[in-house]
């Protein structure tokens, strides 16, 4: 019932907003001026045609072909004309590819929430999925022909099927995700690693449980009451942990105990070595895709397809700082509540010496990142249609001290994200998540909030299964809706013109 409710309610805002956007902005805008004509070339059967300004693979265009093909018979009946297939690939129809993807994405979010939090009520899981469907960056680009919505949908489908241990299907969704946006290969590696963590830690616990059972059996003939009691206690501890290798919905040791991380890494490495052939077989579909992608990079001479001079891989470590703050601000009730501030202080107080060292290291890393690895891409400085343009000019670059003043806020935001994840995730999983986020964001020279969507969703999916009252989620949803109303109103009803270029310009993320 929850899936149907999510799909139906999501459609209630997707359909009317799509109609409004297509009515007011019928022509391709911004990046659509590249994507729409390219998709229309595919609709015409010109699969060898390629716009050299497009940086991403053609996965979205093939999805659109399938989407238009599914609509085409109905369009012929409704219009009662001999409209050709290529004529059916209008801007509005191509945009509807993302509208359908957004509905599917909401259902996937619901399914993942239910899997990670089986004790959650259907009502609360439905509400959480609906709130996450309103995430401003995801919601806004639902109504335009960009790759973001389809990319997120494919990644979530890959993750859900991996959680369910359907690895071949997961790798197929991963292939689609990479074919839509090539940086998704990093998220494919993340999903594969999370699957390996699941598999190896579960295997090691099952082995430990079998050893305890054997010891219990041997001790039964020795009348060792104390030994049997201790073994039963050990068995109980292992059994309670084996039911879920990631302790979904249960608090795991906090980040102050680094021995847990070291032990888990040792367990994963040793178990992986012992099970290396089984792991290679189970996860071989992921390996094939990653190897094929590596061959593509060698053949292509880089990761992007077109406009390579404007998308040079850079060391932009400040990008992960921006991600933490943007994510924390979007979900301020989670990060800046009295309870969360108290929890953060309690975590620091429990092991103040280690916490002090970690805080100092994080602050130093933050200062180094913003001082030496803070980039201002020419696109960022020249295009006042994007909100990051104003963020950079009015806040980050308003004064030379400002970027340093923000470092403690960045660090707090990351600590808050990690402590929320630590309530439901093992530290090895958190480490892999952090590395994947860095792998996607650090090489990217351009500040684009759209790039934060996938790591944001993964954080929210794993923090929501423990936290948060209904009121907290209602407040987050209110923030999302308020931002969406503002950004869409600015996009639709506050157009402006440039003196040096014809056409109407609009504010966009």
Curated annotation (Swiss-Prot):
Residue ranges, compositional bias (Polar residues): 215-229, 239-254
Ranges of the Lumenal topological domain: 26-57, 121-124, 192-285, 333-355, 422-428, 494-509
Glycosylation sites recorded in the entry for this protein: 351
Localization of this protein: Endoplasmic reticulum membrane
Reaction catalysis annotation: an alpha-D-Glc-(1->3)-alpha-D-Glc-(1->3)-alpha-D-Man-(1->2)-alpha-D-Man-(1->2)-alpha-D-Man-(1->3)-[alpha-D-Man-(1->2)-alpha-D-Man-(1->3)-[alpha-D-Man-(1->2)-alpha-D-Man-(1->6)]-alpha-D-Man-(1->6)]-beta-D-Man-(1->4)-beta-D-GlcNAc-(1->4)-alpha-D-GlcNAc-diphospho-di-trans,poly-cis-dolichol + a di-trans,poly-cis-dolichyl beta-D-glucosyl phosphate = a alpha-D-Glc-(1->2)-alpha-D-Glc-(1->3)-alpha-D-Glc-(1->3)-alpha-D-Man-(1->2)-alpha-D-Man-(1->2)-alpha-D-Man-(1->3)-[alpha-D-Man-(1->2)-alpha-D-Man-(1->3)-[alpha-D-Man-(1->2)-alpha-D-Man-(1->6)]-alpha-D-Man-(1->6)]-beta-D-Man-(1->4)-beta-D-GlcNAc-(1->4)-alpha-D-GlcNAc-diphospho-di-trans,poly-cis-dolichol + a di-trans,poly-cis-dolichyl phosphate + H(+)
Gene Ontology biological process terms, A to Z: dolichol-linked oligosaccharide biosynthetic process; leaf development; protein N-linked glycosylation; response to salt stress
Pathway note: Protein modification; protein glycosylation
Enzyme Commission number(s): 2.4.1.256
Protein name: Dol-P-Glc:Glc(2)Man(9)GlcNAc(2)-PP-Dol alpha-1,2-glucosyltransferase
Organism: Arabidopsis thaliana
Gene: ALG10
């Amino acid at each position: 019932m929850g899936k149907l409710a999510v799909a139906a309610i999501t459609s209630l805002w997707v359909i009317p907003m799509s109609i409004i956007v297509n009515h007011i902005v019928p022509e391709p805008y911004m990046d659509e001026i590249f994507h729409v004509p390219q998709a229309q070339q595919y609709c015409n059967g010109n699969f060898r045609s390629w716009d050299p300004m497009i940086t991403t693979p053609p996965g979205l265009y093939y999805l659109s072909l399938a989407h238009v093909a599914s609509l085409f018979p109905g369009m012929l009946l409704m219009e009662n004309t001999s409209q050709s297939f290529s004529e059916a690939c209008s801007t509005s129809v191509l945009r509807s590819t993302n509208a359908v993807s957004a509905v599917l994405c909401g259902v996937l979010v619901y399914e993942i929430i239910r899997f990670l939090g089986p004790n959650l009520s259907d009502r609360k899981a439905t509400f959480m999925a609906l709130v996450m469907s309103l995430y401003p960056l995801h919601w806004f680009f639902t109504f335009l022909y960009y790759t973001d919505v389809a990319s997120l949908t494919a990644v979530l489908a890959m993750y859900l099927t991996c959680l369910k241990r359907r690895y071949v299907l997961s790798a197929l969704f991963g292939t689609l995700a990479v074919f839509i946006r090539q940086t998704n290969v990093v998220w494919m590696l993340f999903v594969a690693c999370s699957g390996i963590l699941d598999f190896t830690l579960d295997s090691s616990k099952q082995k430990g449980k079998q050893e305890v059972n054997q010891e219990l059996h041997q001790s039964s003939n020795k009348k060792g009451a104390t030994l049997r009691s201790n073994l039963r206690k050990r068995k109980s501890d292992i059994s309670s942990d084996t039911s879920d290798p990631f302790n979904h919905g249960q608090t795991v040791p906090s980040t102050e105990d680094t021995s847990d991380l070291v032990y888990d890494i040792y367990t994963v490495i040793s178990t992986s070595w012992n099970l290396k052939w089984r792991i290679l077989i189970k996860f071989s579909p992921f390996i094939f895709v990653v190897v094929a992608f590596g061959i593509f990079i060698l053949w292509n001479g880089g990761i992007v397809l077109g406009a390579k001079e404007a998308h040079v891989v850079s060391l932009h470590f400040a990008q992960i700082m921006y991600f933490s703050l943007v994510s924390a601000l979007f979900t301020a009730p989670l990060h800046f509540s009295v309870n969360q501030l108290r929890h953060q202080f309690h975590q620091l107080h429990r092991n103040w010496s280690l916490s002090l060292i970690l805080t100092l290291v994080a602050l130093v890393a933050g200062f180094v990142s913003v001082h030496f690895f803070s980039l201002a891409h020419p696109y960022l400085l020249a295009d006042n249609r994007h909100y990051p343009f104003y963020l950079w000019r009015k806040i980050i670059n308003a004064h030379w001290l400002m970027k340093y003043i923000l470092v403690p806020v960045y660090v707090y935001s990351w600590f808050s994200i990690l402590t929320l994840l630590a309530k439901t995730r093992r530290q090895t999983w958190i480490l892999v998540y952090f590395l994947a986020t860095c792998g996607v964001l650090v090489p990217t020279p351009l500040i684009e909030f759209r790039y934060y969507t996938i790591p944001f969703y993964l954080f929210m999916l794993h923090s929501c299964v423990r936290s948060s009252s209904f009121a907290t989620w209602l407040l987050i949803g209110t923030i999302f809706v308020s931002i969406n109303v503002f950004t869409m109103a600015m996009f639709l009803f506050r157009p402006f013109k440039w003196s040096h270029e014809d056409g109407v310009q609009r504010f966009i993320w």
